[in-house]
Design a protein with these regions (language model features):
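Short hydrophobic/aromatic-enriched beta-strand-loop microsegments
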Residues: 50-57, 108-112, 131-138, 189-198, ...
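A contiguous loop/helix-start segment that scaffolds small-molecule binding in enzyme catalytic cores
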Residues: 2-7, 78-83, 139, 144-263, ...
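A cross-family signal for N-terminal binding/gating loops and helix N-caps
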Residues: 259-298
Length: 298
């Protein structure tokens, strides 16, 4: 039996932002290879004997190099298994899904790609920031925040073009290089007063949004101790946040709620807590069993 690989975008974090097809791929997987930003609650949807392999990457702390991740995925598929590669966001938006797909093609392994909601769009939405708006931005640009460690210019990033566009700029994985990003944009002509939003843990109950200006954003981030994962949104659309911020106004936003019901009974309550902006934590303390041979109850 030949194996198959599904490269699945897990969305930006909110449990309910996974696609139906993505959920199907999780449920039928023999092996799930998942990263740091994929919501771990999705693993509860897997079948009982599913194998879980964590390959998460944090800043300067990678569980496995990308080549080794590619090898794990391919080898498991060659064993005849259905492999679901679960990635935060979308596999093809700085998710290195293209590299994984190339290897699978080269080795004759069947694969499919299941798109996911990228945090560049979904994350801004949950922060009350539309990535485009008729009166503010008619385009958007998603840019990697990983810059070179030396002082040389990144040949793949045209700072002059970015600084002189009226579109929204979204930098992913850029907190460590925030000072370089802001200074490069200002150097190439972007107004120092351009609004900027820093969105940490976007779409989750612990989402945190800090706004500033291009000139002051680095100092603001240092003062507020902003850490990855954080999106950097640059543009006038940030000004709409106060009007369009629906998520953080939910009654349970920012609260952890422990659910002690048995797992078979907790799903509806967990869903309601999530809908109200809370973070449900399932800690079953109740187990329902059939009563047998209890004379006291006869």
């Amino acid at each position: 039996m030949k194996g198959k690989v599904y490269l699945v975008g897990a969305g930006p974090g909110d449990y309910k932002l996974l696609t139906l097809k993505g959920l199907e791929c999780i449920k039928k997987a023999d092996v799930i290879v998942y990263d740091r930003l994929a919501n771990k609650n999705y693993l509860k949807e897997a079948k009982e004997n599913c194998e879980f392999i964590y390959v998460g990457k944090a800043s300067s702390n990678h569980t496995l190099p990308q080549d080794d991740i590619n090898r794990v995925i391919a080898d498991k598929a060659k064993e005849g298994k259905i492999v679901t590669r679960l990635k935060g966001g979308d596999p093809y938006v700085f998710g290195r899904g293209g590299e994984e797909g190339e290897l699978l093609k080269e080795e004759g392994i069947e694969f499919e790609v299941v798109p996911g909601i990228t945090s560049a769009i979904g994350g801004l939405c949950y922060a009350g920031i539309p990535i485009t708006h008729r009166d503010y931005a008619s385009s958007f640009h998603v840019i990697t925040g990983h810059l070179r460690d030396d002082d040389k210019e990144n040949p793949e990033i045209n700072w002059n073009a970015l600084a002189n566009t009226n579109g929204t700029l979204v930098f992913l994985m850029g907190v460590a290089n925030l000072q370089k990003i802001s200074s490069n944009l200002i150097k190439e002509g972007k107004s120092k007063d351009t609004p900027v939003a820093l969105i940490s843990w976007a779409t989750r109950s612990n989402q945190r949004v800090i706004t500033s200006t291009l000139e002051n954003v680095y100092e603001t981030a240092v003062r507020e101790n902003v850490k990855p994962p954080t999106l950097i949104a640059v543009g006038d659309v940030v000004e709409l946040r106060d009007k369009l911020n629906f998520f953080e106004s939910k009654p349970l936003f920012g609260k952890n709620v422990i659910v002690t019901r048995s797992r078979t009974q907790s799903s509806s309550l967990v869903s309601k807590i999530s809908d109200l902006g809370g973070n449900p934590i399932e800690v079953p303390t109740i187990k329902i069993e059939k009563i047998e041979n209890n004379i006291a109850l006869e």
